[in-house]
């Protein structure tokens, strides 16, 4: 990694060594360098222990790096996102040696989608078999013994805790439950040299990776000029496990009549249905608009 770049990868921000900041921030760095609680001895500091942070911390530790992970809340999250992992995501876990994170969390195989325009108009789309990939899609997937290209759906929180468990099992990973409030910059060349927490603890490492999710507090400062535009919100509820029409499939339910009634340039999003375990099925409804309506 060069020292003059910022890299955004699926919500993770990697900060390196040539950030130009105001003198006030440089003065803060000088103060931090003399802080009584300074901590060092790490190769990488990782802010956030979600899917990206936990998986990356485990991989870096297995490669011999000394990793410090700072996460504001290590309890099991209760969220309605990140519940259906596509086949490519399953293969990525295999590449990282983390496919066993899908074991023991009551995950449901996902073999494709059933898309509905009306109760009588629907089409089933199956994920391809491995042998079909070269001829149909121009590539192959050599990973794993299973010849079926399948995803998994699950409770998001259970998957997060499984990834965290594997991360914490690495002897060279240290986990601190703390909120990171700022990045620390060197006074001389203003590179990022660590982080400061809400309790004023300061930790140092040559590389700092911020993976604190879609609502990252550091995105405005380090993410460039791009600002995500919110077009809609998902509203979710849990249904009984037998609510799915086609087992082991995600369901996309379109509303043709509603789509005809909306104003030009706007559209009504779909409803998504998929089983997330032997105990529940998830229903997500896309609500258009930048602000979620009050209930």
Regions found by a protein language model. Give the residues of each.
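Intrinsically disordered, low-complexity repeat/linker tracts enriched for polar/charged residues
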Residues: 3, 21, 25-27, 31, ...
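Beta1/beta-strand and adjacent pyrophosphate-binding region of the FAD-binding site
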Residues: 37-50
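Conserved N-terminal helical subregion
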Residues: 40-41, 91, 100-102, 109-221, ...
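Glycine-rich FAD pyrophosphate-binding loop
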Residues: 47, 61-81
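N-terminal Rossmann-fold NAD(P) dinucleotide-binding loop
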Residues: 53-54
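Conserved N-terminal glycine-rich FAD pyrophosphate-binding loop of Rossmann-like flavoproteins
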Residues: 74-94
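Conserved FAD-binding catalytic core of PHBH/FMO-like flavoproteins
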Residues: 212-295
């Amino acid at each position: 990694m060069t020292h003059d770049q910022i890299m955004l990868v699926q919500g993770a921000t990697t900060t390196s060594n040539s950030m130009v900041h105001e003198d006030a921030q440089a003065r803060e760095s000088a103060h931090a360098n003399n802080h009584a609680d300074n901590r060092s001895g790490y190769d990488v500091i990782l802010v956030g222990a979600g899917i990206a942070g936990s998986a990356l911390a485990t991989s870096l530790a297995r490669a011999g790096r000394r990793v410090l992970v700072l996460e504001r809340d290590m309890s099991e999250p209760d969220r309605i996102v990140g519940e259906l992992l596509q086949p490519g995501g399953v293969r990525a876990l295999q590449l990282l040696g983390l496919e066993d994170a899908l074991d023991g969390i009551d995950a449901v195989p996902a073999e494709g989608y059933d898309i509905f325009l009306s109760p009588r108009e629907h089409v089933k789309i199956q994920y391809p078999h491995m042998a079909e990939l070269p001829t149909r899609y121009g590539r192959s997937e050599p990973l794993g013994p299973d010849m079926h290209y399948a995803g998994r759906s699950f409770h998001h929180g259970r998957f997060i805790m499984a990834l965290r468990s594997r991360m914490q099992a690495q002897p060279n990973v240290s986990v601190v439950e703390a909120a990171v409030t700022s990045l620390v910059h060197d006074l001389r060349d203003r590179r990022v040299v660590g982080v400061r927490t809400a309790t004023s603890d300061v930790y140092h490492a040559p590389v700092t990776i911020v993976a604190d999710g879609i609502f990252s507090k550091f995105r405005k400062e380090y993410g460039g000029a791009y600002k995500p535009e919110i077009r809609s919100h998902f509203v979710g509820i849990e249904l009984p496990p037998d609510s799915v029409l086609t087992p082991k499939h995600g369901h996309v339910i379109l509303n043709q009549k509603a789509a005809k009634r909306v104003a030009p340039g706007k559209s009504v999003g779909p409803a998504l249905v998929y089983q997330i375990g032997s105990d529940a099925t998830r229903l997500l409804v896309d609500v258009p608009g930048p602000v979620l309506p009050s209930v």
